[in-house]
Amino acid sequence: EIYPNSSLMKTFAQFDALKKGALDLSLYPTTYAGGEIPELNITFMPAVVTSYEQGYRWKKAPIGREMTAILEAKGVKLLTWMWQSGGIASRGAPIVKPDDAKGLKIRGGSREMDMMFKAAGAATSNMPSNEIYISMQTGAIDAAATSSTSLISFKLEELSKGLTAAGG
């Protein structure tokens, strides 16, 4: 059976369930496992992957082999690769330089992104992508870094006045 939109279990619980065999398959961003495996957060860092072609090449590159080995050591089999360009949706002006983040509350998407936003003077909030819309709508966050798919799927354009798009 297929359970869409975290209806079987919460997003952040899926990695542990995959490891334990309680969940058979998940279309799961590797950065969601970054709390346990910090090395996986490299996939969400800005300017590390600059094109879809480069992202796909990681599968057979040394970095891809290492990521696959790390996941397999945790009991998770990586079946396919997908890289998505992303950006920052904001309720106010676009965030294009570090000073633009100062004083804002931002969903960074990974520990490392949170560290960068905090260094720029922002407060951060940790949540899966499917919680961004309501958090922006209620004012719990001012902006969110996320994938292009999430920007579109969760209709963040309805709440955003600014968008900072990444390359790719």
Label the model's feature ranges.
Residues 1-54, 62-168:
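N-terminal secretory/targeting leader peptides
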Residues 57:
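Short beta-strand-centered segments that line the small-molecule binding cleft or hinge
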